[in-house]
């Protein structure tokens, strides 16, 4: 097999998905975004499973990866809708943190060009509340950075889905050929035994 096969391409794509998911996982941990952390963790596990299935010629593992990519695309479309506030969703809710904390996206305060300034608390507030943090000068708003992350994940998943389907179809054809070869060998072996007798 040459290096430009669908299998090699899927291996490279899975490796790229792992790097991308790990990068996203780090920034979600920094922002205490528990729902995306859980999703990224599951994604990393399934991509490793798909990578293993591709390397070891295990089409069932690749099928699990294929089903997961459809779910992963759905999750990332939801994240895009969440940050763009489509369909009644609001990026200012605590949905991504499971309503555990008031943390938001790490990019909200640390995006490119952002200047973070802590304002003095009022008499009624507490210092750890995010309403006392002022962020100015951002080159790109945080919600667009999150949308870009999700769009990259969708693109990688869609390409991965196509390659995974291709590798599964090739694997199934090879299994059919192999089982046919076994039947031919069995038939020839029986004929040889009959000739010897």
Swiss-Prot record:
Spans through the membrane: 2-22, 35-55, 62-82, 152-172
**Can you supply a Gene Ontology BP term from the record?**
regulation of sodium ion transport
Signal peptide interval: none
List the GO cellular component terms. plasma membrane
Statement: the UniProt record of this protein carries the keyword Transmembrane helix: yes
Q: In the UniProt record, does the keyword Translocase occur?
A: no
Intracellular or extracellular location(s): Cell membrane
Q: Which keywords has UniProt assigned to this entry?
A: Cell membrane, Membrane, Transmembrane, Transmembrane helix
Q: Which residues form a coiled coil?
A: none
How does the protein's chain sit in the membrane according to the entry?
Answer: Multi-pass membrane protein
Give a Pfam family name.
NKAIN
Family under the similarity heading: Belongs to the NKAIN family.
Q: What is this protein called?
A: Sodium/potassium-transporting ATPase subunit beta-1-interacting protein 3
Species of provenance: Homo sapiens (Human)
- Gene from which this protein is expressed: NKAIN3
């Amino acid at each position: 097999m040459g290096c430009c096969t669908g299998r090699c391409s899927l291996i490279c794509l899975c490796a790229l998905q792992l790097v991308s998911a790990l990068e996203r996982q780090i920034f979600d941990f920094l922002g205490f975004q528990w729902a995306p952390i859980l999703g990224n963790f599951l994604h990393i596990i399934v991509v490793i499973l798909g990578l293993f299935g591709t390397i070891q010629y295990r089409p069932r593992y690749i099928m699990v990866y294929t089903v997961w990519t459809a779910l992963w695309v759905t999750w990332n479309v939801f994240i895009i809708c969440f940050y763009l506030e489509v369909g009644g969703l609001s990026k200012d809710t605590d949905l991504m943190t499971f309503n555990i904390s008031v943390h938001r996206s790490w990019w909200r305060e640390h995006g490119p060009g952002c200047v973070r300034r802590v304002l003095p608390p009022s008499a009624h507030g507490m210092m750890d509340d995010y309403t006392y943090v002022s962020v100015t000068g951002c080159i790109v708003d945080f919600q667009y950075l999150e949308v870009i992350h999700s769009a990259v994940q969708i693109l990688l998943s869609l390409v991965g889905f196509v390659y995974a389907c291709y590798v599964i179809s090739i694997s199934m054809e090879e299994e059919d050929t192999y089982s046919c070869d076994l039947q031919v060998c069995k038939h020839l072996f029986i004929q040889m035994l009959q000739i010897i007798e």
